[in-house]
């Protein structure tokens, strides 16, 4: 739409009896009857190519640092910039003249930071009878220069550059087959990897009230997660939180390379002060970028924060279209839309045999921490793991504040799941005894029950809680988790010859401290094994054979 000489981007969201309803991705002040409208005939799309990593985009894929240079502090409407940096790349061809190609096939590669960036045939190319007519030799070329020409049996020719365009609401399906997500995505957070695992190519959601630690948890997953690329979609979060992400991510050190985490990260931010429709687009933009890097054989982790704001954007658009409202005025198709977004996650086998994945983790911000509201319920039906943060645990400073009893996961973890279930049953029984003790007090509780309660508290404090600001305890490798859980499991399963409550409390307090000291030792160092031996000797001194 042309308004005051500026072209505002919009998307047609409904056509009814010759009347098109348009959603504008900018502030729509000043639009009047008679303003000219241009139809491009294209779907809402993003540009994909080398140079996307390290960038910060808005929901429409405008690079925000470049926009800031051009517009100053406040973004002007109608300003759109190229998302792909204007530069040359060192291209190496991987096909030759006469080779058959189809959608999603690689025609060459360029080095991008830590990765080899595959240059691919557009995913939207139709037909399988295309052949390479000409391809450039190895050398340095501009990102938008033609590097390959392909033609089909009808004589149609298509010029290809390093940049391809992909509609954001169409999933990329250029792969051999989808696989079952069975390999754990290691986050090095004990409570997630052992008790509530996430799989590569799986989905998980993190609902929780404000201030429960969702953002720090996301930082830890981004920093220590076993993913090649991390994409953060901050859609509709408060501007303050987005600023925090933008400030902290470049400072976070990537433990794998020792360089900045930003080198393998893309951030897409649409704060709650930006227009509503662009907020809806930002989730789809993020997942399209994730699928693009998946096609190169990489494992991608997409963190969407927060899907509640995205659903609220849908609610506003649905209201303007005068559609029949569902529960809490959300549209009736809320569930299917959320499901279609999470279904774009997955582990796939590509045509060249590589296994790659997109893992989607969405945070949900239910009003007042009420998990019964429609967005949380619709999300729970489609995700494979639920990490519910609780206000009660964050107030008690038990971090990460994932509630071990309310949360669940359908995936397999890094520790033997049968043992984890036994440990979880101790946690449940300990919690029941704790509830009973609040009524009858310690005096009315038997020594046996009191020991079970203390075992539950021990498991919670030494294994489920983790200090993300401690250089050693912040990241706990799978081997270390198995080792520590093995010792803790034996201590939990042992029977203790203790009758006096004060003696029981003193014993478990000391055992807890020994475990916490163990967390501070370097894995497989002499101190690590010495502390392990000390713990075993200490609990066996009171255990009954």
Model-identified regions with their sequence ranges:
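P-loop NTPase nucleotide-binding/switch module
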Residues: 69-112, 119-122, 142-202, 217-220, ...
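N-terminal accessory targeting/assembly segments
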Residues: 1-76
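P-loop NTPase catalytic core
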Residues: 194-195, 201-514, 524
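Metallocofactor- and cofactor-centric catalytic cores in central/energy metabolism, strongly enriched
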Residues: 8, 18-20, 42, 125, ...
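A structural micro-motif recognizing beta-strand termini
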Residues: 3, 15-16, 22-28, 41-42, ...
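C-terminal amphipathic alpha-helical interaction region
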Residues: 499-545
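Short, surface-exposed secondary-structure boundary micro-motifs
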Residues: 4-6, 42-43, 61, 106, ...
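Conserved hydrophobic positions within beta-strands
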Residues: 12, 56, 106, 129-132
């Amino acid at each position: 739409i042309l308004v005051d000489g500026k072209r505002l981007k919009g998307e047609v969201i409904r056509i009814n009896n010759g009347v098109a309803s348009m959603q504008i991705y900018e502030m729509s002040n000043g639009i009047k009857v008679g303003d000219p409208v241009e139809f491009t005939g294209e779907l809402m799309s993003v540009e994909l190519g080398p140079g996307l990593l390290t960038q910060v985009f808005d929901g429409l894929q405008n690079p925000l640092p470049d926009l800031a240079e051009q517009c100053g502090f406040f973004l002007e409407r109608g300003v759109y910039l190229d998302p792909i940096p204007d530069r040359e790349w060192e291209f190496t061809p991987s096909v030759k003249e006469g080779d058959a190609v189809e959608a999603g096939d690689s025609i060459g590669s360029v080095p991008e930071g830590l990765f080899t960036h595959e240059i691919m045939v557009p995913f939207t190319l139709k037909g399988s009878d295309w052949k390479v007519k000409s391809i450039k030799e190895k050398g340095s070329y501009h990102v938008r220069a033609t590097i390959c020409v392909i033609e089909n049996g009808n004589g149609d020719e298509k010029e290809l550059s390093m940049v391809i365009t992909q509609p954001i609401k169409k999933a990329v399906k250029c792969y051999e087959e989808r696989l079952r997500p069975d390999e754990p995505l290691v986050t090095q957070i004990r409570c997630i990897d052992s008790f509530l695992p996430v799989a590569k190519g799986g989905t998980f959601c993190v609902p929780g009230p404000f201030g429960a630690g969702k953002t720090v948890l996301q930082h830890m997953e981004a920093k220590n997660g076993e993913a090649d690329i991390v994409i953060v979609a901050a859609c509709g979060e408060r501007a303050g939180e987005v600023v925090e992400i933008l400030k902290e991510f470049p400072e976070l050190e990537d433990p794998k390379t020792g360089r900045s985490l930003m080198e393998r990260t893309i951030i897409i931010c649409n704060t709650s002060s930006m227009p509503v429709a662009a907020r809806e687009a930002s989730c789809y933009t993020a997942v399209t970028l994730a699928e693009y890097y998946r096609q190169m054989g990489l494992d991608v982790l997409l963190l969407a924060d927060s899907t509640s704001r995205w659903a609220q954007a849908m609610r506003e658009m649905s209201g303007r279209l005068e559609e029949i409202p569902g529960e809490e005025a959300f549209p009736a198709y809320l569930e299917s839309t959320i499901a279609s977004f999470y279904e774009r996650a997955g582990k796939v086998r590509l045509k060249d045999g590589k296994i790659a994945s997109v893992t989607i983790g969405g945070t949900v911000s239910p009003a007042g921490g009420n998990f019964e509201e429609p967005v949380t319920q619709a999300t729970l039906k489609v995700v494979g793991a639920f990490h519910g943060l609780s206000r009660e645990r964050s107030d008690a400073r038990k971090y990460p504040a994932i509630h071990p009893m309310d949360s669940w996961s359908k995936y397999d973890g890094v520790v033997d799941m049968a043992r984890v279930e036994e440990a979880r049953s101790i946690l449940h029984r300990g919690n029941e005894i704790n509830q009973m003790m609040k009524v009858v007090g310690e005096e009315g509780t038997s020594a046996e029950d009191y020991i079970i309660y203390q075992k539950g508290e021990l498991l919670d404090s030494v294994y489920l809680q983790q200090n993300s600001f401690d250089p050693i305890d912040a990241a706990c490798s799978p081997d270390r988790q198995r080792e520590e859980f093995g010792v803790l499991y034996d201590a939990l399963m042992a029977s203790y010859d203790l009758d006096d409550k004060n003696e029981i409390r003193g014993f478990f307090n000391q055992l807890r401290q020994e475990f916490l000291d163990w967390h501070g030792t370097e894995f497989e160092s002499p101190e690590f094994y010495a502390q392990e031996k000390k713990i075993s000797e200490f609990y066996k001194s009171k255990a009954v054979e």
